[in-house]
Every structure is written in structure tokens, then in C-alpha cells.
Amino acid sequence: MPKFPQFRLILVLFYLISMIQWSVITFSLGFFLNVCIFAYFVFFKSLPDLPKPQPRFVDIVPESSNTVDVDKELKSVEGLIQDGNAQIGKELESIVNLIIKDFVQPWFTKIDKNSDAEFLKVIKWRLLQTLLVVKDKLMKNDSASLIVLKLLPIFNKHFSTFCDAREAVLSDLTLERHKSANIDLQIAVEFNKNYKIHKSLSLKPNALQKEIEKSIRKTVIGLLPHLFDNDELDSLLVFTLMTEVLTTCIISPLIFKFTDPDSWNLRIVSLSQNYFEEKHKVHKIRRMLSKELQDHRKVMNDVANKDVGEPSSEKLELNAEYTGKQFEHYLNQLDSLLDLSDIKYVAYSLALKIYQLKENEHLTKENLKYKKRLLLSLNLIESKLSFPGSEIDTASKKLAREANYPDLNMDNGIVLKEMASFLTSITLKDIVDDSEFLPFFESFLGSVPETQGSTFLEYSQTIESFKNPLEDATSEDIISGYSGISTMQLQEISSKFFHNNNLQNMKLLDEGLVKNIILFRNSFQINNDEDTFILARKSVLLLQTEAIKYLDDRFLPLFKKTPSFLKMLSTSHIISTDIYAHFLSRIGGVNNPEQNKIIKDNVKTDFMNPVRIFANPGITDALDNIVNGSGSKPHKSRISSNPRYSQLFGSENDNIFKDKLFDDENDNTSEISVVEDQLDHPRNMEKVSVSSGNSGLNPSQFYGSNNFRDNIASLTISIDQIEKELELLRHLILKADLTNNQMQLKILKKSQRTLLKELEMKELLKQQYMVQENGNSLFRKTKIYIRSYFSENSSNGLKEITYYIINIHHFNNGQVSSWDMARRYNEFFELNTYLKKNFRDLMRQLQDLFPSKVKMSLKYHVTKTLLYEERKQKLEKYLRELLSISEICEDNIFRRFLTDPTPFKLNKEYMHDDILEEPLHEPIGSSNSTSNSSSVVDLQSSEDGGELNFYEDERHFFTDSGYPFYSQNKSFVKQICDLFISLFALNKANAGWLRGRAIITVLQQLLGSTIEKYIKVSIQKLRSEDQVFEAIVTFKNMLWGDNGLFERKRNETAEATRSEGERLRTEQLALTSLQRLFADTCGRVVGLRDSHEAAGRVHAMLQNPYLNASLLLEALDAILLDIICND
């Protein structure tokens, strides 16, 4: 091969000669030829071969099976995603499969048509891993703080700025400009001057969606390092694919949907319709329950004439194969049971079958349904055994308060508890002494690998068959009766049980006793000695005792865990045994005529009998009619503006409740007409709307001692009535869940929540009355905590007023009630002055605890925040010290300070006794006052012990152990109040009486609980598995459902787009629906006009797509920063 330098020189010379001598064509051909030759030698002979190019996405698929087993990893992550709740895991996996189907397979099938390709498995694996990361971060996130402390201020500022911008634009536009101008864009521009829209939006025409998607893509790019490993993101395809999937498949569709005003309008209309339909159905259900209670005498005429018959020879049995009709017939048979022995046998049989199913951890769908039927039937039977004052009766009342009826997790039932104790109490002697039960135990011993069990049982029975009943192996005086027969028996026992394998088993009991018997056997032929015989016989009896103990300690517990044990107790022979008699004694004693008479009397008088109500076909038909919407709907003029109460108990003349404290207005129509007459006078209107609930109570007599007792008595009757209704409703919910009637279940649960809310409010009001009426109601029964304060400007705007929010927790009769009280520093100061005047000696030790007033010389040199924080801590400590002094706790004025939400002001001319005679004013809204802002928590403890633990356990309310919603030192009151003020424009000069402490009171009326508790508990409910599952299903249907976003895109050619006229009609309908919704929920406390105006402002804000996009993107940034990128 020639040397390259010489060759290159020849080429250069040749090239120069060609340039000079050849023609243009010859030159071109020569040049091309020379270049080809030059390239061949230089590049292909002197440089190494380049590798063949590969697509970069192959890097995410393992090159060999040694790197990672994709199938194994995928199976593992699928198991982790379903850990905790299989339903949620399956829905998430289904969404991942849909993402791959819609966004990966369409282009990947052009490379590989195999639907089971390893690349698709890797993508699924990575997406599921991402969901696990998100799940872990969500579990660690404080959702309440995120929503209230971060998202709520964003929305509040956005809403306030929008209202100002809208007012400025509309006041500036003339009529001509108004017709042609883009109002939404004008408002967005004005909004941008004051608050700045999201940085990614430019407000350019027709660029909104592109800018939204660009912003989301940029956000996702910053998000990926928190969801994936860096090694995975090094692959360009992984990075690009994950970015596009998260952007175009998950986040962008949601933002686009809620940016469109028409989507909001449709959702508002749907929400409003569903709300009022459900509210109407709830009212009808309450009327139906009330009617059943009122008409019980007529319904029970036939039942009252029944005579208690003899015990039925045919026992009722519920089989797993029963159809729905057969199960209904079985329930009717349960209702007809009047003999106590029959009732108790059914209770025994049902409880035993439930325990049989509990042994199986993985029940089939059929067995799960069967278990629910068994639980329901047992619950109904317990109601028939519930005599007044009995343990079952007390437990039933307590269970009626609980809100988790549909779970059917009723292992706390009295019969089930007694059954568990009964099964534990069954002894080996009970089984061995019964010829019907013994074969089950023998069969079990024969099935286990250890042979000593069968040997010991046979040995014990053999000894029992020949020993004298009076013989005692532990006594020195053994009645042996020396004879040839006894000697032969010992010889037979020795030859049968003390040879070969049996000998080894017997040595496990006592090797020394075994040696005594072997010694007797060996010496029997040689020396027939009586002493040796007695020793052997005593050893035989002692070994029997050891054998029984061995069986009892080792084999009986194992036998009780097998299906054979429960099968043994399920035989028909059981009712004639001592074991069954022992069970009957546990659940109320043996059958007797007196208890049968009680059963019959209960049938006649107990119109709340849930068995009868449950089996009543009339109630079933009525529920079907209510749920299916049959029957007339209420006229608009008759719809009360109060969402909680409105003729819920039938006719006005029925007088189910005798107390007028809780009556809604006698005529809702007249109430609405009065309120509507005040539309032109907003201040009067608000006063009417709040005080209208007080018509049944004379304020001047509110604090009379006799009136307190009357109110407490009326409340007791009302609470008892509600508890009975809850008991009935509980069985209806169980039946709806059992029959899988989801429509009934939904409306019944809503009715249950309404009843529970009303029950809590009345119980709280009862406790507040008891605090006012009883001088011993505070000491060692009350705790307080000042978590926050709330400031606002006075009505004239000259000074700032601060209210300290006192959280009060009161213990009474095993229950803890909590409410909030807003007090100014001046009110604390007036209380302190009063107490120092009337309790001089007691207050001397507390004079240094009360925070002093700020001196005028220091007024402008003290930071307000530090001042308020210091006062908050000192006032809390001061109140706690007051509650530790019994004499002060007995003072009426001090009790009023903690229970009456009206301004606390005393006439300083009066002394202690005279002040007590001063009539106090009724709290705002009476039954809708702060008492409605309560929560009642059952401590499930005895009164004395519970009160002692409540008082001494300082951690009960101030740590996670008692109230998890008070776990962090963060207050939500200010954010909620600010939002309420912005929503209803209460910061204006004409806001009227609704300021300061009234805002706190009104908010608690609307929320039905203390503010912070309501927020925490509501968010905890949203984080529950049921709510999470429902949200995931809704998200899935929104994008991939029959009418989902992607499905509509596929069929957009066939789908008719909504016309401008349809959109306008929906917009107007949404406005009226939202106004009606606001008026119904808030009209009674803020007035109809303010409710309508607030609804109009919210509706107008949702009609601006630019600001919708800005708000959603800002909220998205805050959510991702707090949840995903917080590390």
C-alpha cells in the first residue's frame, strides 16, 4: 500500500494541472473523482468504524434480564398501589392503563405492534411508582393548613381584587362601549394593575389555552425531578414522554375544563338542583318517620291483640342461599316472634353463624352479603331483647348516635360480645361429658399429627369408666376396694397404655407416675402386694388428672379455632344442653312468664320497634316513592330559607315536640314575606333574619330558673325523640346497604347527618342551660383554650378592635361539648373588676396574672402583634386559674361570661346579689346561636371517673390524643373570617350589625361547629378512603367516561357544539341557581339581599376565563410547592 504523504502530493499536483489545462467539464469530472478517492483513503482506511445509531428510548428497557425483572417489579408495585384499599388501587391502575392506551400505544404500535411489549410494562411500572411517590407525599401533608392558610388567602385576595376591578370597569364603561367592549378582558387588565395575574398569562387574544399549556409544561418539567430518579430522566424519551403525559393527559384537561365559564355554569346548575332535591327528600323522610311514630296505635291494633303463644317447635334459620324475597319473609318472621326462648335461640344461632364467617379472612361476595344479612338480623333481634334499662337498651341508644352505620361492623353488639365470652368459657368437661359433642372433639384429635391427644382422651375416659366417683387421687384415704376385678383393670390399663408409642406419650405427663405403674405390672406375678396396688392405682388417677390438664391447656384452644367447634355448637341438640342454658343466662336469664309479658307489652307500646319498622312494606314503598321523586315537590313560596329546619315533622298541629324553643316559624310563608318586605332596608332585614328564630321564647325570661328547668325538660324530650328516629333510620340505612340500593342509601345518609347535627345542637344547648342553671356545673368540668384572636376596624374606622376566641369544653354525663366565645379585652377587664370586688380574698393571688392595660406613653411604641400574643397567653392562664376556684365557678356572672355570646357589660352600681337579678339578653338566634356551633364528643366513661380524668388529663384537648384538630399551633379563624367578610362585602360602611363577635357567631351557625374543628373534621372526611375513591372515580369519568373529555374529542365531529344562546341561557340559570343556593344556606344570618349580591359576585368571577386561568395556575403552583416540592 503506498504511503499517504506521497499520494497526497501527487493528488495536489494533479489537481493544479487539471485546473490549468482542462476544460470546464473535464475539470468538474476530475474534481469529483479526486474527492471520492481522497475521502476513501482518508476516512475509511485511517479512521475506525462508527457504531450504528440507536433510538435513545431503548435505554429505559433493560438490556438483559440480569439488570431488573420488569414483570417482578411491576407486580410488586401493583401490590403496593393496592395496599390499604384495593378499590382505590384498582382505579388508579385503571387510569394508568388508560393513559398508556391513549398516549403511548398509538405511536409505539408503529415501532412494535405487540400489546404486551416490555416497553409498555416499563412505562406502567414508572407511572405506578410516580403515584406511590405522590401518595406518600400526600399522606405526610397537612391538608388543612394547605387549604386554609395558603389556598384560602389566594382565593380571598383574588376575589376581593376582582370585585374592585369589576366595579371600576363597569362604572367607567359607557353604554356604547359596553356593547362592543370585551368586558372580561377589560376586567382582567384592571385586575392586573392591582394584583398581577399569573406570570405565564399575557392576555393576548386567542392565546389563552396555548399559554396555559406552556405554563403547565414548564411546571411539570420542574416537578419531574421530585417524582423520578435522575437516571431515568437522563433518557430523553422518558423525560419527554413523562412531561407530555402529565401535561396533556392529566393537568391540562382539568385546567381547561375549569377555565371555561360554561363548565362552571353547568356544574352550578347541577349542584343546585341536586341540593334542593336532596333537601326536599330529607324533609319527606323526616315526615315519614314522624308519621310512623304518631300513627303507631293504629298500625299496631292487630299486633296488640296477639297472644303470646307457646315456643315454636320450628326454629328460624337464615340460609346463605336466600333470595331477597325470602330474606324479607325471614325478617317478617322475626317480627312475629313473641316467645323469649325463640328470640334467644335465633340470637344464639345468628351470633354463631357470624363467628363461623369471621374465621374466614377472605370472604366471597356471596358470603360477604350473607354476613351482612346475619348482622342485620342479629341487630333486629337485639332490639326485641332490649328491655327498658337493660344493657342492650343502653347500648342501642349509644349506637344510635354513631354515624358509621353502613359499615355493618357491629362486633360491638351485646349478643356478639356475650357470644365471644361464652365461647371462651366452654370447658373440656362440657364437651367430654356430652355424648353428642364428644365425637367432634375426637375427630379433631384424630386429624392432628400429634398422637398424644387421642391417647390422653382415651386414657381419661377409660379411667373414668371404672373409678369410684368418691375416689380422690390427692387424698391419702383412697377407697380402693382391693379385689381381683380392680387388679385386672389395672393390668389391662397397664398393657394398653404403657407399651410402645403409648408409653412414650404417657411419659410426657409424669415419668415417675409411669414408673410406679410399670413396677406394679412387673411385680404383679411375683408379689401380689396391696401397697404396690394402691400406689399404682393412685398413680393411674393422678395421670388422669394430668391428661385432662394437658388436653385442656394444649388441644382445647386449638379445637376452638377450628370450624368443627362452631359446627358442634350448631347442632339441634344444643338447646337441651347445659352449655346453651349457660348462654341464655348471659343474655338476660332463662325464659319465664314475666319476661314474655314484657315482650308482649313492648310489642303493644314500643312504637319505635325497629324490627316492625324494618319489615313494614309501607315504609319500603314510601322510601321508594321519595327516592324516585314521585309525589309533589314543594312550592317555591313554601321553601324555607333555613336549610336545617322546615316543618320536618309533619303537620303543624301534631305537636310532637311541646317545646317552642326549637320550633321554626309557625308559618314559613309569612316569614319569607316579612323578610322580602325588608329588601329595601338591609339593616332591618338582617335583624329580622337572625331574630326570627326566637319567636317561641321571651328574652326577658330567658334566665329565669323555672324557665331553665322547662327548657332542659323540653330538650330532654326532643333529644329522646331524635335518638329514636336515629335508631329507625339506622335500620333503614342497613337495609339499603344490604340490598345495594345506592339511591336510598345516599338520601338516608344525608337524613342521618341532618338528625345527628340537630341532636348535637340540642345536646349542646341543653348543656349550656345546665351550666347557667346549676352552680356546680363548671368546677372540674370545664376547660378553656384561647388559640387565636381576630381584629377588625370599628364601624367609624377610628380604631382597631380585637376579639379573643375562647374555646370552651364542658364535660357532663360522659359527654364533652365544645363551643367558641368571642370576647374583647375590655370585657375581660370588666369581669376581672367584678371578681376583685366580690371575691377579694380569692382574687388576691391572681392579681399578677391579669394583663394590665397599655400606658398611653407606650401606646405607639408597642408592637400590636406581640401585645395581642402576650394578652392571649395571659388571658388563657387567667381563665384556667378562675376555673380551678369552686366559689368563682358557682358565680352566675362568670358562667354568663362563658356561655352568653352577647356583649358582656355590667352595671357597676349593682353589688353581687343585685347583678344576679338583672335580666340578661338572649343569645343571637337562640337555638341557632353559639349553641349551634357546638360539637359533642362521647367519652364513653362513667360520670365520676370520667370527670376526674377529664379535669386531670391536661393533654385531653390540647394534643392529638383527644382532639387531633388542635394538634398544631395554627389558627384558621382569621382566614375564614376574612373570606366571609370579602364574600358578603362586610368591610363596607353599611355592613350594619354583622361585625366583630357577630361574625364569629354567624360563622358558627353556618358551619354548625367551632370554626377550627369544622375545618379539620371536614378535611379529614375528604381524606377518608370513601371520599378519595369517589374523587378518583369522578376524575376518571370526567376524562374517560361516556361523556368525558377524551371521549368527546373522539366524537367531536358527531357532537353538536353548544350554541351561544344555550350558553347564555345556562349562564342566567346558573346565576339564579347560585342566588337561590346562597339564600337557602346563608339568608337567615346575612339576609337575602346580601346573599343574592354575594352569589352574583361569585358568579361574575367565574365568567371570566382569564382570571379563572390565573387563579387555577396560582393555586396549582401553591399545591405542588407544598405537597411535592416541599423537600
From Swiss-Prot:
Single GO cellular component annotation? Answer: cytoplasm
Q: Does the keyword Coiled coil apply?
A: yes
Q: Can you cite a GO biological process for this protein?
A: piecemeal microautophagy of the nucleus
Which key words are in the record?
Coiled coil, Cytoplasm, Phosphoprotein
Query: What SMART domains has UniProt attached to this entry?
Result: PX, PXA
- CDD domains, alphabetically? PX_MDM1p
Q: Which residues carry this modification: Phosphoserine?
A: S670, S673, S692
Gene3D superfamilies assigned: Phox-like domain
Q: Where in the cell is it found?
A: Cytoplasm
Residues annotated as domain PX: 782-905
Positions the record marks as coiled coil are 705-762
- Entry's Gene Ontology molecular function annotations: phosphatidylinositol binding; phosphatidylinositol-3-phosphate binding
Query: Superkingdom, according to UniProt?
Result: Eukaryota
Q: Which residues form the PXA domain?
A: 85-273
Q: According to its UniProt record, which protein family does this protein belong to?
A: Belongs to the sorting nexin family.
Quote the PANTHER family the UniProt record gives.
SORTING NEXIN (PTHR22775), SORTING NEXIN-13 (PTHR22775:SF3)
Q: What else is known?
A: Present with 784 molecules/cell in log phase SD medium.
Which protein are we looking at?
Answer: Structural protein MDM1
What is the native source organism of this protein? Saccharomyces cerevisiae (strain ATCC 204508 / S288c)
User: What taxonomic lineage is listed for the species of origin?
Assistant: Eukaryota, Fungi, Dikarya, Ascomycota, Saccharomycotina
